[in-house]
Structure formats: C-alpha cells, structure tokens
C-alpha cells in the first residue's frame, strides 16, 4: 500500500510539473514577454522539479560533513561535458551561494535562462552509472519511460524566454518569490554569462584542442596524436593569420574611407575657395567694365558737346546773316576794337580747342594702348597739370585693374590645377578602393578554404576523440597494484606537503597580526609624544598672549579714549577668535595626529607584508631557478649518456668492419702464399729434372770425349799404317765431334739458363718466405688486436650495462626528486607562467594600441598640415585682398583729392568766366553807346570799310574756330558747373553737419566751464580743509611715529606667529591628505588580504575534499585489483589450453605465466617482453599485455625491446602525467587574457583533463569548486565568447551603462568648467580600489569647448571610458557612450586624449578597475579646457 501511494504521488507530481511547463509556455506565448520571478507557474515548476530531483536520492556527505544534494549530481554528470559545464562554472563563480541546495537552484535558473534545461537533464539521465550511484530504484530518473516523459515535456521550455536575476536572492534558503529589477531584458543572458578564458573563437578552439591533445601526447607519446597536433597547430596558425589579415584589411578599408572623406571635404573647401576667388575676379572684371563704361560715357558726353557746338555754330551763322543784312552804321574804331577782342577770344578758344583735342587724342591712345607720335607732340602746346594728373590717375587705375584681372586669372588657373590634382588623387583613391574590393574578393576563397580547414579540423577532432576513447579504454586495463599504491602514496605526500605549506601560510598571517598589534602599541606611544608636544605648543601660545597683554597698556595710556575703546574691543574679539581658532586647530591637530598614527601603523604593516611577499617571491624564483637548473643538468646527463652510447656503438661497428677487412686481407695473403708455395715446388721439380738431364748430358759428353780420345789414339797409331783408309772415318768422326760439341755447347747454355732461372726462383722463394713471415706476423698481430678489441668490447659492454643501470637508478631517483619538487612548485610555476602570458598579451595589446595611436597621430598630423596649408593660403589671399582694398582706398582718397583740386580749378575758371562776362557786358554797353553815336562816325566807317573788307575775310575764317571753341567751352563750363553745384551741395551738407558739431561743442564747452567753476569752488573748500588737515596731521604725526614703532614690534611678533601657524596648518593639510591616501590604500590592501585569506581557506577546503576523493579512489582501485587478481590468477591445473593460440598443454608443451596479468600461455606464445620497472629490466608477458604496453609506450619493436632513454615510463600514473600536461598547456597557451592577478587556480577544464587522463580510476564524484581568477578579471568589453553565448551578448554600449548601474563606486569627483580651467599645472591623485571604479563628472554649460586629459596609473593598467549624460536627472539608460571601455597601458606611459563638446551636459570620465580582483590602482590625472577662437574681422581697416 505504501509503495502504491508513493507511486501515485510521484505520478501526480510529474503531472503537476508537466502542467506547470505548459502554463509557462502559454503565458509566454500570450504575453510575449520573458517570464520573471513574479510568475506563480514558475514557482510551481521550481518546487515540483526540485521535489523530483530530491526524491529517493541517496544520502551523501562531504569530507567536512556537509550534505550533498542534486547540485553534486549535476557536477558528477556534466563536469566532463564541453558546453554544459559553463553553467557549473558560472554557479561556482557566485560567492553568495554556500550550500549545495542553493547552487543547484542557481544552476536550474541558469539552464532556464539559456533555454537548455531539457538538454542538461537528458545528458544527466543518459549517464546511467552516475544516476544509479546517486538515486535508489524508486527514482523516476532510473525508469526510462518516466524520464523520457519528463524530458519531452521540458523541451517545451526551450522556446520560452526567462528574465531571471543571477544575484540578489538567498537561494540557500528558498526559491525567489518576486522579481528583482534587472538592467535590461536584453542583458539578462549577458549577466548569466560564465567567465570566459579566451579572446577569440580560434583561440577557444585551439585551447580546447590543446587540452585534449596535450594530455594524450604527454601521457601516451602516440605518433598519430603528434601528427594530429601538428596539423591542429598549423590550422590554428592559419586561422590566426587569416583573422589578423582580415582585421588589417578592414582597418585599411576604414582608413581609406576616412581619407576619402577628408579629401572630399578638402575638395569641397577648395571649391568654395575657388568660388570666392572667382566672385572676386568677377567683381574686379565688373569694376574694369564699369571704368570702361565711364570712359564710354565720357566719350558720349564729348559727342554731345560737339553736337551742341555745331548747333551754336549754326546759330552764329544765322546771327552773322542777320548782321550782314543790317546797315553798317557803327564806326571803324568800334570795329577795330571788336576785331581785337575777337582776336583775343579766338586765341583763347583755339587754345582750349587744342587742349580738348589733345585730351581726346590721349584718351583714344590710352584706350588703344598706343603712344602719341613725336611730331604731333612737338606741335602741341603744353597741357594743364590738373588734366595730366587726372589722366595719369585714370591710367594707373586701368593698369591696376588689369593687374588684378591678371592675378585673378592666375589664381583661377592655379585653382584649376589644384582641382585637377585633387581629381587625380580622388581617382587614385578610387583605384585603391577598387584594389581593396579585389582583395576582399580574394579573401572570400580564403574564407572558403578556412571553412574547409574547419571541417577537416572537425573530422580530425572526431578521430582524435575516437582515439582518445580507445586510449582511455586501453588505460583502464593498465592497472598494477604496486605501482598505483606507490602513486597514491606520492599523492598523499604531496597533499600533506600542500597542507603543511598552507598551515605555514596561516602561521605567517598570525605572525603578521601580531606585528600589527605591536605597531598599534607603538602608535599609542607616538600619540602620547604628540600630546606632550601639543601641551608644549599651548604653553607657547599662552606666553604669546601674555606678551601681547604686556605691550597693550602703555599704548592705551597714550591714545585718546575713543581709540582705546576701539583697541580694547578689537583685542577682545581677536582673543576670542584666536582662542576659538586655537581650540579648533588643536582638535584638528589631535585628529590628524591620531589618523597619522593609524596610517603610519598601517603603512608599516603593509611595508612588512610587502617585504615578506618580496622575500617569498625571491625564494620561489630561486627554487624555480634551481629546479630548472636540475632539470637542465638531468637532460644534459641523459644527452651525454645517449651520445656516449651512440659513440660506443659506432666504435663497435667500426671495429667490426676493421676486423672483417683484416680477416679478408689475411685470407687473400694466405691464398697468395699457397700459390707461391705451389709455384716454388714446381720450379724445384723443374730444376731437379733439368739437373738430371744436365748430368746425363755431361756423362754422354765424357763418354764421347773418352771415345774421341780413344779413337784419336787409335787413329794416331793407325795413321801411319792406314792413313788413307781412315780418312773417311776421321772426317765422319770430326763431323760427329762438331755435332757433339755443338750439342754440348747448347746444353751448357741451357744449363746456364736453368741456373739463372733457379737463382731467380730461389730469390722469389726467399721473397715469398719473407712475405709469408711478414704476413704471419701481421696475422698474429691482427689476431691479438682482435682479441684485445673483443675484450675491450666486452668490458665496454659490461661498463655500459653498469652505467645504464646506475643511470636508470639515478634517473629514477632524480625523477622522483624532480616530481616531488615539481609538484611542490607547480602552483607557483603556473602563477609565473600566467603572469608571463599576461605580460606577453599586454605587450601585444600595447604594441597594437601603440601602432593604432601612431596611425591616428599620423593622420592627425597630415590633417593639421593640410589645414595649416589651407590657413596659409587663406591668409595669403586675405593679405592680397587687404592690399587691394588698401590700394583702392588710396586711389579713392587720391580721386577725392583730385576732385577737390578739379573743383578748385573749376571755381577759378567760373570766376574767370564771370569776369569775362562782365567785360563782354561792358563792351556791349560801349557798343550800344557807339551805335548811338553812329551818325557821327560814318566818315570813319567809310574809311574803315576797306579795312573791314580786308579784315572780314580773316574774320570769317576765324569765326568758325571761335564758334567751335565757344561751344566746347560752354559745354565744358556747363558740365563743370553741374559738378561744382553738386559738390557745393555736398560741401553745404558737410558744413551744416560741422556747424551742428560746432554748436554741440560750444554747448559742451559751456557745460565744462560751469563744471570748472564748480570744481574751483570745491578746490577752494578742499584747500581750506587740507590746511586744517595738515595742521591736524602735524599734530598726529608724533602720535603715529609712536604707534608705528609699537605696531612694527607687534607685527613682527604676529608675522612670526602667523608663519608658524601657517606652517603647522600646511603640515596638517599634508598629513591629512597623506593619511587619507594611506587610509584608502590600507583599506584596499586589507580588503585584498581578506580576499586572499578567504580564497586560501576555500582552497584548503577544496584540497581536503580532493584528498578525500583520492583516498576513495585508491580504496576502490585496491578492491578492483584484488578482484582482478583473484579472477586472473588461476591454478596451473585448471587451465588446459593456451589463452592466445588455444594449443593444448602436455608434457611437451609447457605452461608459462604472464608477469603482469598472470595469464597462462604456451612456449610458442612466450616471446613477448616489456619494460615495466624504472630499472629497465624486461619481463615476460602475454600477447595482450605486450600490445597494451607497446601502444602505451609508443614502441614498435615486436621482439620486446625496452623503451629508449629519456622517455617517460609507460606505467606512469595519470595523476603524475596530468600536472605535466597542465604545465605544458600553461606554457603553450598564448592567448591568456591580460590579468593583474598574482594567483593561478586550477580551472575546471584542467580538472576534466585530469579525470580524462586518469579514467582508469573509478568514477567517484569530486568537488572542485575552484574558480580561475583570470576569468573573473577580464575586461567588460571583451569579445571573448563561447559559441553558446554569442546570441545573448548585448550591444557594446551597454557595458559602461551596466557598470554605472550595478558596479561598485569608489570615488565620485564633480567638477565644473571653471574648476577645470583653474586646475593648475600639477597632477591630482585618484584612488581606485580593486573590483570598483571611480568617476570624474565635468558639467559643461556651453558648446564648443575642448576638454583634454592626461593620466597614468600605478602599479598596473586600468580601463578608461567616457559617457555623456544630459542632466543629473537623466536615467542611465539614456546616456550615450562617447568612448567605449578600453584597457590602457597607463602604467607604462601617459595616456592623452581630448573631447570636443557638441552638446552642453555632464561628461563622465570613468576609471574602471572592476576587472582586477586583488590589486588597487592609483591614477594621476590632469585636466584642461580650451575655448574656441572666434574671428571677429578686427584685422580689416
């Protein structure tokens, strides 16, 4: 019944969970907004899921006794899964969570936010081994149907978005029941983002591949993995190079776009300048056209005057006709007078006509640009000076206008040339842009190749994973009891050593606390001393007051009563003020002394801590150097031994070759000796045969000689008796004798030849015998040498074997010692490697930033140079225009002066004409009188008729000229009269204005006279008053001398007192500032020390947990080894067949045992040997163990040869191999993020690697909640994202806003423009604690200002950004980021920058140190404000 009730309850809970999931999906679809903590369905879902996760769970506890929950189950299942462990890393990074239950709840919320809860639970349920280890049989997770139903229902939540706050709730107590306001809906996933360890996708892939490849390559030394590693390294390098090239191309494109925009702006500016210059040229041309039109108008006026002259001539002719018709009544005298007057008039008219003609001719010549011929100039009369000046002025104006026109044309031509050049530059830029487009097109196939490489890398990765899986399966079968016991013993010793080091650090901290208490006591003693000094100063102040009171009474006796009262009041006020000020100063002094004491104590404590840290760092560096030296010496010894072994082998081979050569030479010599002996025997036989023949011939010769003698004797006896009978016989005998003699001679010759041959053969024999003796001696020497070489070889082999044994023993000892030392110093080595990688990354970033700054500076310099050229051109044009304006003004002034001169000349001419008019009127009156007296003069007329007739002809001739001259003069006078009248009008207006001004000046003079009179009266009064004052002054001079002496004395004393007070005040201010700074630094350092202490405590707990887990592993391994030993070690009689070849054992086929696994095999399968111990001894094993050890050690020798010297033993445990792989990974990791941390922590990926490399151990869960501080100190604007988080990243602008909203503010300094303007030349200090940021706000009320800054930081770099806020009430979401957060190398160089104010508001300068968890920064900054220079045209006249 109980079981059925629990099953029904479980089914009801599962149905409720499914209903809650469907309600959440419906709520999201209907509302369209993310689910928050306010949702009741979410509360229901959380409780139901937690109930299922805790249902029928096995009770487990950690080493410290804390209960384990489903969080530890998640860690055990997902610690090795790439991507799924991001949530585990994030939850471990939250320091607020203390219990396993709270961490599990945070992990479920993380999975909901990232929409991967169903995938995570499915991965956990698929690991049936771990699930059965954590849950009993009644759990629904062990039932496939129920677990599949739960996961299938949870997959509906993958499409639902959740907006849950990552922090701010007490998840250890309960689930959240209300929604806390987050930064933004888009930043929720960003806040849930786990700490990243890489800066780009390629580095992320490379780091992951390195973690997989390093373990396999260092543990197993497999050639396949080495090839895969090389290919992966090459692909990673190609990927990095392609990324760098793509970035360079993008930067180049952007730079070319900026240059193109700048050139377009330049072209537009120069086009505007050209337009202005063209307008100027058009104005000059219009002026010249106006002058030409003026000349044309003058010509028209001349034509009009000629027409009027013609009209006057016609009128005169009509008058002459009328005069002819009249009777000749006047007398001859009157006619003569009239003739004289007409002559004078004709002469004047002729002169004027000549002047007009010359002027017209000169004007025509000036227009045509020709000169007057010399013959006409000779006949002309002198022209008046005013007309010459006027003509020269007109000519000069024309020339100036022509010069300006030519200058304008030249400027136009230059501008057109500039435009052509700019057009060419634009064309070049367009061509460059086209080339860039081609380059971009070329990048496309490279990207395709890159994608292909990525696919190949994925295939290689799969192959690598398969090989790793195979290797892990092989490693599980490589366990040996003694070796693993030894490994666990070593690990135990390492853990004990780490525990002792941690206890030693705790003792150091306790000693530091004791030093701090000692410093506090010292500070109290200093406080007492300062109190004594304060008492002494108060006594001195009392003495000064007494002195002031002593000097006071004699002065008061001499002063009048009123002055004495005033002085008493002032003394009372001063005394009260001075007492109050002294009390305040004493209080401030006391406070400052206390604070100074505290700060000095803290400073000394920090200095001692710093010295201790420096000593520790020096000791670590020394130990590291010693370890490196030992490793180098070991490597050197190994190399020497290998070299000596190779040399011995080579010498042995060379000796063998020499022995073979000597043996071949000996054999050849022996064959030669045998051949020579055979030849000598043959020669000996031939000599013996020839000697026998010679003897036989000698016998025959002697016989024949005897016969001859006998015959000769017989012949002599018979010669007497028978001379004739024996003559024939005698001839025959003589012939025979000759024949025999010839044969004997021949035989003698042959004997001589044979003797010579015999001698030669005997010589050859002697030679051969000597050579044979030499060869035998050489052979004996060679045999002895060979024997010696064999003995030496055997001795060398024995010595080499002994050396190898000694080296192997030494190597084993050194390896053990190096392992111990390396494991001791491993953590410090990692820290140093991390710092090295950080310094390298920071140096690379600094180089990149320096290059970018140089490019920006170069572009700014080019822009400023171009602007300077434009400004110079504009100033030159301005100067030219000013000169032109000045010349025009001068010409206008000259024309005005010339007009005045002309006006004067015209006035004179008008006066002359009036006089001539009066004379003509008198003459007309005289003519009328003469006409009245005409009757009396008829006689004279008759006499004068002849003269008149004679003169009439001349008069007719001269009349025409006079008429023309008169008409021209009349028109000229009329024009001059008109101009004179106009100028007179202008002069009248000017005279009226001057009269008004004179009237105003007269009124002002009258007012001044009135004021003068009043001033004279006042002066009289003041003079009388001065006389009285002088009298009083004389009386008071004596008093003032007395007072002055007393004042001087008191002033000196006061100056001394004020100088001392000022000195004390300055010292106090300095001490206040120093103590504030020291307070801030000490608080930050204390905070840092507390954090490190807390971290070390957590690390100690983690190490204890790891130690417990390792003990559990060792116990499980021992148990498994015992079981395997019991299973494998079978009796000899129980096994009847060989395990390898299945051959039946008999009395011929014997049984053999494997020295590793205990299997039994036959004689035919026993030819397998493997090295399993550091001593290098080979042991017989079965075929399966030989294959396992052969693959593990990378040996290809089937005959059982051992591993080479210098390689690690194949039976090294995974726990020993993992630190090496981790260290190498730390060395090879290039893209470690820049960091200020001085600690290095084992990350989760490294723990996963250790677990993968040590997969032969039983899979028991371990708690490794350590977190890498490198990941927590990354920049907020970093683009390093895992592939799962790229879609949850907000815009780059939100990082600064998020910092302002949720970051911890250290200091906020509000400033105004006036305060920045009065900043001074020095720098100010700003303190930024670790994990905080400081803020400088500058309020700007007017646009156009330029704010500049220079800052540096100490001891490390800092991040900087600028944000704009319209008003203080403006929400932070509406702020604008002007300069995004950038990491500046301000600890190496000064960082400069400026900002042009476009909109009035508040500009926030942010110094961000949130990326640094342990190190506080000091920022020295300097601010300036530049106002814009506005040109008001004051340079023009």
From Swiss-Prot:
Residues 1191-1227, 1253-1289 are annotated as: Disordered. The modification Phosphothreonine is found at residue 372. Expressed in heart and testis. Expressed in the eye lens. InterPro entries: FYVE_FYCO1, GOLD_dom, GOLD_dom_sf, Run_dom, Run_dom_sf, RUN_FYCO1, Znf_FYVE, Znf_FYVE-rel. Residues 1218-1227, 1253-1283 have a biased composition (Polar residues). Zn(2+) 2 binds at residues 1154, 1157, 1182, 1185. The modification Phosphoserine is found at residues 196, 837. Residues 4-30, 223-270, 305-846, 873-1110 form a coiled coil. It holds the Pfam family FYVE. GO terms for biological process: plus-end-directed vesicle transport along microtubule; positive regulation of autophagosome maturation. The modification N-acetylalanine is found at residue 2. A zinc finger (FYVE-type) spans 1132-1190. CDD domains: FYVE_FYCO1 (cd15726), RUN_FYCO1 (cd17698). Keywords: Acetylation, Coiled coil, Cytoplasmic vesicle, Endosome, Lysosome, Metal-binding, Phosphoprotein, Zinc, Zinc-finger. Can form homodimers. Interacts (via C-terminus) with MAP1LC3B. Interacts with RAB7A; the interaction with RAB7A induces FYCO1 recruitment to late endosomal/lysosomal compartments. May mediate microtubule plus end-directed vesicle transport. This is FYVE and coiled-coil domain-containing protein 1.
């Amino acid at each position: 019944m109980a079981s059925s009730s629990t099953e029904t309850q479980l089914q009801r809970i599962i149905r409720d969970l499914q209903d809650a999931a469907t309600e959440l999906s419906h709520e999201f679809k209907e509302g369209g907004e993310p689910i928050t903590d306010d949702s009741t369905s979410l509360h229901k879902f959380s409780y139901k899921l937690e109930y299922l996760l805790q249902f029928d769970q096995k009770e487990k506890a950690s080493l410290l006794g804390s209960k384990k929950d489903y969080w530890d189950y998640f860690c055990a299942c997902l610690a090795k899964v790439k991507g799924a462990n991001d949530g585990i890393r994030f939850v471990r990074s939250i320091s607020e969570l203390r219990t396993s239950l709270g961490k599990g709840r945070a992990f479920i919320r993380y999975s909901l936010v990232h929409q991967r809860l169903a995938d995570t639970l499915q991965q956990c349920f698929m690991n049936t081994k771990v699930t059965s280890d954590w849950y009993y049989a009644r759990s629904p997770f062990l039932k496939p149907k129920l677990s599949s139903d739960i996961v299938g229902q949870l997959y509906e939540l993958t499409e639902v978005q959740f907006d849950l706050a990552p922090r701010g709730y007490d998840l250890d107590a309960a689930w959240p029941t209300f929604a806390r306001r987050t930064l933004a809906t888009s930043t929720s996933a960003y806040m849930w983002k786990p700490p990243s360890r890489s800066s780009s996708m390629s580095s992320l892939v490379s780091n992951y591949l390195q973690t997989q490849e390093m373990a396999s390559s260092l543990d197993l030394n497999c050639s396949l993995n080495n090839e895969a590693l090389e290919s992966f390294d090459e692909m990673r390098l190609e990927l990095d190079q392609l990324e760098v090239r793509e970035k360079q191309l993008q930067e180049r494109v952007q730079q070319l776009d900026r240059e193109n925009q700048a050139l377009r702006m330049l072209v537009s500016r120069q086009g505007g300048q050209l337009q202005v210059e063209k307008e100027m040229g058009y104005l000059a041309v219009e002026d010249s056209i106006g002058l030409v039109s003026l000349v044309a108008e003058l010509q028209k006026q001349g034509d009009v005057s000629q027409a009027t002259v013609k009209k006057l001539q016609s009128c005169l002719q009509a008058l002459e006709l009328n005069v002819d018709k009249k009777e000749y009544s006047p007398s001859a005298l009157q006619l003569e007078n009239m003739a004289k007057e007409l002559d004078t008039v004709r002469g004047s008219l002729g002169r004027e006509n000549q002047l007009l003609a010359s002027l017209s001719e000169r004007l025509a010549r000036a227009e045509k640009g020709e000169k007057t011929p010399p013959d006409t100039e000779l006949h002309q009369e002198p022209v008046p000076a005013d007309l010459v000046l006027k003509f020269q002025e007109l000519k000069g104006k024309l020339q100036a206008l022509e010069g300006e026109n030519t200058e304008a044309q030249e400027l136009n031509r230059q501008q057109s040339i500039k435009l052509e050049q700019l057009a060419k530059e634009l064309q070049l830029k367009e061509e460059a842009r086209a080339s860039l487009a081609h380059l971009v097109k070329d990048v496309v196939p490279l990207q395709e190749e890159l994608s292909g490489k990525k696919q190949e890398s994925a295939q290689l990765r799969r192959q690598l994973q398969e090989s790793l899986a195979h290797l892990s399966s092989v490693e599980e079968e490589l366990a040996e009891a003694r070796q693993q016991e030894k490994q666990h013993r070593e690990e135990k010793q390492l853990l004990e050593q780490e525990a002792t080091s941690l206890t030693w650090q705790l003792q150091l901290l306790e000693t530091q606390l004791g030093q701090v208490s000692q410093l506090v006591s010292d500070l109290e003693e200093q406080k007492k001393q300062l109190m004594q000094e304060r008492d002494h100063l108060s006594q001195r102040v009392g003495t000064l007051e007494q002195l002031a009171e002593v000097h006071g009474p004699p002065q008061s006796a001499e002063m009048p009563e009123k002055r004495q009262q005033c002085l008493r009041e002032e003394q009372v006020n001063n005394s009260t003020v001075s007492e109050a000020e002294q009390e305040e100063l004493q209080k401030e002094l006391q406070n400052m002394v206390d604070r100074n004491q505290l700060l000095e104590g803290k400073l000394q404590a920090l200095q001692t801590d710093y010295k201790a840290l420096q000593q520790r760092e020096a000791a670590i560096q020394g130990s590291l150097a010693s370890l490196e030296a030992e490793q180098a010496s070991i490597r050197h010894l190994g190399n020497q031994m290998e070299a000596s072994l190779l040399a011995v082998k080579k010498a042995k081979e060379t000796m063998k070759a020499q022995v073979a050569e000597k043996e071949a030479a000996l054999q050849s010599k022996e064959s030669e000796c045998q051949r020579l002996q055979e030849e000598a025997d043959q020669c000996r036989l031939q000599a013996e045969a020839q000697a026998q023949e010679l003897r036989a011939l000698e016998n025959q010769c002697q016989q024949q000689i005897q016969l001859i003698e006998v015959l000769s004797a017989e012949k002599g006896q018979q010669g007497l008796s028978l001379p004739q009978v024996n003559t024939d016989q005698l001839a025959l005998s003589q012939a025979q004798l000759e024949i025999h003699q010839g044969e004997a001679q021949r035989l003698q010759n042959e004997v001589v030849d044979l003797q010579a041959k015999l001698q030669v053969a005997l010589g050859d024999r002697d030679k051969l015998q000597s050579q044979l003796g030499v060869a035998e001696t050489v052979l004996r020497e060679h045999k002895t040498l060979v024997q010696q070489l064999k003995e030496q070889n055997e001795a060398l082999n024995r010595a080499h074997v002994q050396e190898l044994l000694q080296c192997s023993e030494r190597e084993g000892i050194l390896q053990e010692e190096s392992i111990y030392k390396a494991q001791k110093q491993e953590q410090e080595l990692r820290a140093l490697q991390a710092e090295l990688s950080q310094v390298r990354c920071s140096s690379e970033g600094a180089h990149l930033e320096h290059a970018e700054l140089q490019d920006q500076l170069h572009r700014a310099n080019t822009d400023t140079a171009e602007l300077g050229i434009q400004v110079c051109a504009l100033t030159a044009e301005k100067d030219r225009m000013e000169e032109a304006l000045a010349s025009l003004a001068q010409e206008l002034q000259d024309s005005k002066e010339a007009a005045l001169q002309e006006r004067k000349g015209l006035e004179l001419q008008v006066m002359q004409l009036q006089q001539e008019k009066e004379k003509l009127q008198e003459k007309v009156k005289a003519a009328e009188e003469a006409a009245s007296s005409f009757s009396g003069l008829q006689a004279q007329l008759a006499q004068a008729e002849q003269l008149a007739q004679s003169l009439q002809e001349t008069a007719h001739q001269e009349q025409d000229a006079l008429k023309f001259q008169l008409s021209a003069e009349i028109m000229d006078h009329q024009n001059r009269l008109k101009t004179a009248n106009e100028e007179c009008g202008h002069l009248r207006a000017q005279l009226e204005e001057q009269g008004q001004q004179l009237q105003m000046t007269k009124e002002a003079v009258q007012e001044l006279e009135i004021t003068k009179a009043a001033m004279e009266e006042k002066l009289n009064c003041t003079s009388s008053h001065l006389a009285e004052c002088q009298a009083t002054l004389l009386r008071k001079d004596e008093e003032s001398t007395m007072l002055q002496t007393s004042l001087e004395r008191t002033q000196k004393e006061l100056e001394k007192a004020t100088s001392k007070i000022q000195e004390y005040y300055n010292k106090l201010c300095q001490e206040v500032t120093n103590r504030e700074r020291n307070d801030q630094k000490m608080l930050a350092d204390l905070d840092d020390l507390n954090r490190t202490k807390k971290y070390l405590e957590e690390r100690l707990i983690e190490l204890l947990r790891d130690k417990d887990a390792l003990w559990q592993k060792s116990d499980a391994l021992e148990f498994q080894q015992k079981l395997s030993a019991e299973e494998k070690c079978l009796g000899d009689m129980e096994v009847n067949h060989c395990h390898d070849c299945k051959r039946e054992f008999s009395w011929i086929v014997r049984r053999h045992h494997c020295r590793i696994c205990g299997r039994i095999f036959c004689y035919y399968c026993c030819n397998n040997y493997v090295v399993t111990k550091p001593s290098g001894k080979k042991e017989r094993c079965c075929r399966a163990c030989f294959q396992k050890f052969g693959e593990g050690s990378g040996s290809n020798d089937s005959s059982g040869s051992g591993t080479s010297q210098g390689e690690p033993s194949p039976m090294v445990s995974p726990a020993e191999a993992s630190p090496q792989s981790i260290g190498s990974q730390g060395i090879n990791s290039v893209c470690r993020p820049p960091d200020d941390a001085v600690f290095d922590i084992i990350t989760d990926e490294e723990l996963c690697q250790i677990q993968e490399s040590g997969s032969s151990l039983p899979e028991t869960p371990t708690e490794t909640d350590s977190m890498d501080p490198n990941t927590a100190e990354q920049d907020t604007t970093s683009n390093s994202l895992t592939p799962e988080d790229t879609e949850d990243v907000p815009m780059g602008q939100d990082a600064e806003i998020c910092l302002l909203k949720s970051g911890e503010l250290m200091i906020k300094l509000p400033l105004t423009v006036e305060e920045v303007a009065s900043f001074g030349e020095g720098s100010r200090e700003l303190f930024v604690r670790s994990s905080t940021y400081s803020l400088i706000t500058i309020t700007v009320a007017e646009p156009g200002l330029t704010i500049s800054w220079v800052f540096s930081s100490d001891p490390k770099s800092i991040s900087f950004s600028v944000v704009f806020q319209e008003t203080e009430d403006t929400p932070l979401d509406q702020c604008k980021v002007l300069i995004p957060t950038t990491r500046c190398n301000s600890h190496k160089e000064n960082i400069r920058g400026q900002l042009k104010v476009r909109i009035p508001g508040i500009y926030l300068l942010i110094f961000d140190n949130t990326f640094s968890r342990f190190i506080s920064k000091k920022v020295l900054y300097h601010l300036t404000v530049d106002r814009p220079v506005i040109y008001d045209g004051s340079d023009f006249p």
